[in-house]
Amino acid sequence: MQRLQVVLGHLRGPADSGWMPQAAPCLSGAPQASAADVVVVHGRRTAICRAGRGGFKDTTPDELLSAVMTAVLKDVNLRPEQLGDICVGNVLQPGAGAIMARIAQFLSDIPETVPLSTVNRQCSSGLQAVASIAGGIRNGSYDIGMACGVESMSLADRGNPGNITSRLMEKEKARDCLIPMGITSENVAERFGISREKQDTFALASQQKAARAQSKGCFQAEIVPVTTTVHDDKGTKRSITVTQDEGIRPSTTMEGLAKLKPAFKKDGSTTAGNSSQVSDGAAAILLARRSKAEELGLPILGVLRSYAVVGVPPDIMGIGPAYAIPVALQKAGLTVSDVDIFEINEAFASQAAYCVEKLRLPPEKVNPLGGAVALGHPLGCTGARQVITLLNELKRRGKRAYGVVSMCIGTGMGAAAVFEYPGN
């Protein structure tokens, strides 16, 4: 019945402000550990760098991907040939980066006998890779797999939608798929009353939380140092080692944010300061069937309890998490109050703030280490990065707990996954 109510809510559409998504209560208590559980063994990511001007501006995505693939296997001392499959999320490379990702595999000394695929569900591609590998484990295709995400927004063509029929003009929703993301942010702000001040307040909080987390070293366990080469304007090359996220601005103030001009619309409220940053980065996550992880003596960082993806109107795609999270919680038998951390991608402060309000999430539970406004949003990488950040933060806290990863998706979707940290 609850699932039906959620689906009916989708059909009524977001304009129905009277609808409040609710997850079904947990009737049987916390899930019991099962040998068939899909568990997260380990995950690492690169630092996230500013596209076009940061430490990875001249680094190809296969190199970024290889760095995290190699680190994850080395950290847990797993032989590469023990992998049953690899899935890589990517948005901007041709063919979702299928050739690039296979090259990264070989750069990481993972043998050709290990298969690989790539997936593009836009901003949720990294999380979709996790879901794809989890599906293979659940259906018995293999016991261990690697889910990754990578994006070089420095080196990719971001403005080409590909070969599209002129008939799209005949269908409103088809046309809406080509609306610039910044305009969808403005649509959310206008239709749901998310003011410029509210967006800037959200953005400031993201920067402050990320700066505090970085100063405390909270990201160190996640980040793989990457030594690479950068070229200056004169063509001079130099070697650098990138060890920390570049987009965090500790000196951000409300006054500074208020001075920024609208980025997408003359009288708009979405600015460079309250939007996610264009970024480069990669992440890799090792998943396994619990029984296999225990057999090999591998650590268990978390358990994937549910995954959901839903559709929403393309012109307000940013509302996706507000519709995906209730479905994922319902699948896991949980409510909002059962969750300690919500990692919601901050594509834009407008849509993130809307989702927090719509779901009535306690602000202190949302992105406690900051989000994409401060850290950046390398499209294919983000979902995997969020999983790693979430589970490492739950590990720092120590107790058994649940966390949610969610994001909006261009062309009108939302994805969400529920993870359990088993406790120290």
UniProtKB/Swiss-Prot annotation:
Changing residue 7 to D/K: Abolished localization to peroxisomes. It holds the Pfam family Thiolase_N. Induction: Peroxisomal thiolase is markedly induced (at the level of transcription) by various hypolipidemic compounds in parallel with the other two enzymes of the peroxisomal beta-oxidation system. GO terms for cellular component: cytosol; extracellular region; membrane; peroxisomal matrix; peroxisome; specific granule lumen. The modification Phosphothreonine is found at residues 59-60. It is found in: Peroxisome. It is an enzyme of class 2 (transferase). GO terms for biological process: alpha-linolenic acid metabolic process; bile acid metabolic process; fatty acid beta-oxidation; fatty acid beta-oxidation using acyl-CoA oxidase; phenylacetate catabolic process; very long-chain fatty acid metabolic process. The active site is at 123 (acyl-thioester intermediate), 377 (proton acceptor), 408 (proton acceptor). One of its GO terms (molecular function) is palmitoyl-CoA oxidase activity. Residues 1-26 form a transit peptide. Pathway: Lipid metabolism; peroxisomal fatty acid beta-oxidation. Changing residue 9 to D/R/L: Does not affect localization to peroxisomes. It comes from the Eukaryota. Residues 1-26 are annotated as: PTS2-type peroxisomal targeting signal. NCBIfam families: AcCoA-C-Actrans. The PTS2-type peroxisomal targeting signal, which mediates interaction with PEX7 and localization to peroxisomes, is cleaved following import into peroxisomes. Responsible for the thiolytic cleavage of straight chain 3-keto fatty acyl-CoAs (3-oxoacyl-CoAs). Plays an important role in fatty acid peroxisomal beta-oxidation. Catalyzes the cleavage of short, medium, long, and very long straight chain 3-oxoacyl-CoAs. PANTHER family: 3-KETOACYL-COA THIOLASE, PEROXISOMAL. Belongs to the thiolase-like superfamily. Thiolase family. This is 3-ketoacyl-CoA thiolase, peroxisomal. The gene is ACAA1.
